[in-house]
UniProtKB/Swiss-Prot annotation:
InterPro entries: Fe_traffick_prot_YggX, Fe_traffick_prot_YggX_sf. Belongs to the Fe(2+)-trafficking protein family. Could be a mediator in iron transactions between iron acquisition and iron-requiring processes, such as synthesis and/or repair of Fe-S clusters in biosynthetic enzymes. It comes from Paraburkholderia phytofirmans (strain DSM 17436 / LMG 22146 / PsJN). PANTHER family: FE(2+)-TRAFFICKING PROTEIN-RELATED. This is Probable Fe(2+)-trafficking protein. Disulfide bonds: none annotated. One of its GO terms (cellular component) is cytosol. GO terms for molecular function: iron ion binding. Keywords: Iron. It comes from the Bacteria. One of its GO terms (biological process) is cellular response to oxidative stress.
Length: 91
């Protein structure tokens, strides 16, 4: 049976994650209140931040930055955007 959550990011009821995606309290909050759809949107945003900012994930500061961005994306005012990113136009 599919687990449904009231998604804090999307503001609607949607399919929940199968397991906490991160360790600790933040992972628990995401598991309890974020949908699969919103998590997939975060993975795309996270990839852009890593690539555009050339983050080295072996660097603890880069990992800490991403954890803060994760929390802001789901529960705050929104994560940073990649500087200079222009979304492709639909032609």
């Amino acid at each position: 049976m599919t687990r449904m959550v009231q998604c804090a990011k999307l503001g609607k009821e949607a399919e929940g994650l199968d397991f906490p995606p991160l360790p600790g309290e933040l992972g628990k909050r995401i598991y309890e209140g974020i949908s699969k759809e919103a998590w997939q949107a975060w993975l795309k945003q996270q990839t852009m931040l890593i690539n555009e900012n050339r983050l080295n994930m072996a660097d603890p500061r880069a990992r800490q930055y991403l954890m803060k961005q994760t929390e802001k994306f789901f529960f705050g005012e929104g994560a940073d955007t990649a500087q200079g990113y222009v979304p492709p136009s639909a032609e």
